[in-house]
Amino acid sequence: MKFTIKDVFLVLAVMITSMTSFKSYSQDAHQMWLEGSKGKLYALLQYPDEVKKDVKYPLVIICHGFSGNCESEMQKDLADDIVRNGMAALRFDFNGHGKSEGLFQDMTVPNEIEDLKDVIKWAQKQPWVESIGLVGHSQGGVVVSMVAGELGNKIIKAEALMAPAAVLRDDALRGSTMGAYYDPYNIQGDYVELPGSPEAGSLKLGKAYIETAMTLPIYETARKYTGPTLILQGTHDRVVPYTYAERYHEEIKGSQLKLIEGDNHMFSNSLRQSCQFVANWMKTQLEGWKVINVNI
């Protein structure tokens, strides 16, 4: 089902009429270091203002995409909106990204999966965590979908996939990843040099990343998840064609698919509205009630 950016804005305007004026919670984030697959993971934890002793709260874990980090605008907006909805938000840098330990060259989707599992294990040990939901963007969406498929809905109560990059497997098979071209069956050396960019600079894509991506059972694993699933993507996404979101929708039974007409991979035209939409949706799943019943 497709809806325009204007439609999203109007729906969300209704949803948040009872909310107070905008307040950024990012400055209140608690810096943490958690164990991961390649060393320490840098993380930021935010609580609702009204956090109380001996009270449990839903926790939403947010996963960034390929070459991203937990301090990007999207990650901050998601965390702030989640906290404003009375839940806790934990965002972290995958190994080899941002401030976390490890080399980008050694990063693979399988070891990012292990990173997320390690973060979830930490969350399960916290006495204040009532339930766990996952949000992932791009490659982070693939990681979220596979972890949810592996752990099931007894542990992961809901997942939201924002422009999930299942295309990464096809990219590896055809030898084209983020502007770099290579022979996937005859990689020279230990890595492929990615074109430089203002955001990421020059990065080395490890041979292990390509080899594991080529056989990654993305949909086979993701379809095992039977809990609530939201899939959100723009129809003008040039990084991941929205047909991959449609495939996710077909594979994960009972999932909700929302296509934003004209938006891109980073949700540039609707970032605030999209983050609010995801946070509101997650609240309804983790707290068991809806702010307002709206069919889009």
Feature-to-residue mapping (PLM):
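Short beta-strand element of the alpha/beta-hydrolase
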Residues: 55-65
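Glycine-rich nucleophile elbow surrounding the catalytic serine of serine-hydrolase chemistry
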Residues: 136-146
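N-terminal cap/lid segment of alpha/beta-hydrolase-fold proteins
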Residues: 25-55
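Conserved alpha/beta-hydrolase
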Residues: 79-101
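The alpha/beta-hydrolase serine catalytic core
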Residues: 31, 41, 142, 149, ...
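Alpha/beta-hydrolase fold nucleophile elbow
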Residues: 127-138
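The serine-hydrolase catalytic nucleophile loop
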Residues: 67-79, 94
